[in-house]
Amino acid sequence: MSAIVDIVGREVLDSRGNPTVECDVLLESGVMGRAAVPSGASTGSREAIELRDGDKSRYLGKGVLNAVKNINTEISEAVLGLDAAEQSFLDKTLIDLDGTDNKGRLGANAMLAVSMAVARAAAEESGLPLYRYFGGMGAVQLPVPMMNVINGGAHANNSLDLQEMMIIPVGAPSFREAVRWGAEVFHALKKILHDKGISTAVGDEGGFAPSVESHEAAIQLILQAIDKAGYRAGEQIALGLDCAASEFYKDGKYHLEGEGLSLTAQEWTDMMAAWVDKYPIISIEDGMAEGDWDGWKLLTDRLGKNVQIVGDDLFVTNTKILKEGIEKGIANSILIKINQIGTLSETFAAIEMAKRAGYTAVISHRSGETEDSTIADIAVATNAGQIKTGSMSRSDRMAKYNQLLRIEEDLGDVAVYPGRAAFYNLR
């Protein structure tokens, strides 16, 4: 038995300079696991609650001392002596202890930090890398990265309403090559922007945040960069969008303020469909607002056979909401964010439910990240096939890419890079 003998929570800082929760878990054998949780900017209204102090005299009210206190008192008392190898029992203990539907009492940030740190300690105790501990011998598939090269919306201060424009190296022969292709396109895009006199400042997730006249102009810049780097758009590198449409949905319409447009769900669907016809876009995330289920149905019926339609704010990594979406034929993919739900067991349950329904599961970072690379291991452990973890800059993003490079090396000849096959929800 790998008994938990000590737990220490602390307040650390994320990539935006805001406080977040880190936790150390010590086992009887002397082995320690450490984990830090991320934090989002554009958040779904039904996400598990991230506990913040609200004390304006500290960190503008964003301190997490109450969450840390919960770890060091109540949570510690409940889990000391438990077997770290019993992840599902530990997570259920945390859920029952919290007693709310949204983890609002103890805080999803406190609970997730403990859940992750316990898993890390148990993996260390077993002598296995984290991906192997979670996934067993079948964990051999690297994820296709969706690299956010142009940021807008809540992730940047520019004229773009859509939050992310991504490159997806579907034609690469390996993860290592996929990363190289992405880096080369990133640097080609930087040169193009520089030569046009456009800012090369980066947003929260490491992508560029240019002010350009339209979303199509931004897409065309990416296509130029793919060509300049020596790759073929569509065949080798596809495109993905994260609209984060809840952020610009108001009074029943979608307001693209940067372009002076106010659109119904039908008109907005028509606009996205026109982009899909014109450009090699194979994935659209949060194309509709989280509450506009009629709009989601419209979008899924129109584009869902040829385009991955990903629910993020829509599903918030929650199996109850995902089940409803599957029954109603809404979307064909779920974005997986561990801090939206607050424990690893519930995260794995959402991935499993998606796969059983023929939906893909895209493992994702948050805009406020840390050096913690757990999501890289989760992507391989679950054979998810896809990961979103930012652009080719900022060490909080590179930590995940670098961990995946290590995992691919560790797997050696058995490593699989699925490429376009990762999009098994498309016909």
Curated annotation (Swiss-Prot):
Its cofactor is Mg(2+). One of its GO terms (biological process) is glycolytic process. One of its GO terms (cellular component) is cell surface. It comes from the Bacteria. It catalyses: (2R)-2-phosphoglycerate = phosphoenolpyruvate + H2O. Pathway: Carbohydrate degradation; glycolysis; pyruvate from D-glyceraldehyde 3-phosphate: step 4/5. (2R)-2-phosphoglycerate binds at Q163, K337, R366, S367, K388. Belongs to the enolase family. Catalyzes the reversible conversion of 2-phosphoglycerate (2-PG) into phosphoenolpyruvate (PEP). It is essential for the degradation of carbohydrates via glycolysis. This is Enolase. It comes from Leptothrix cholodnii (strain ATCC 51168 / LMG 8142 / SP-6) (Leptothrix discophora (strain SP-6)).
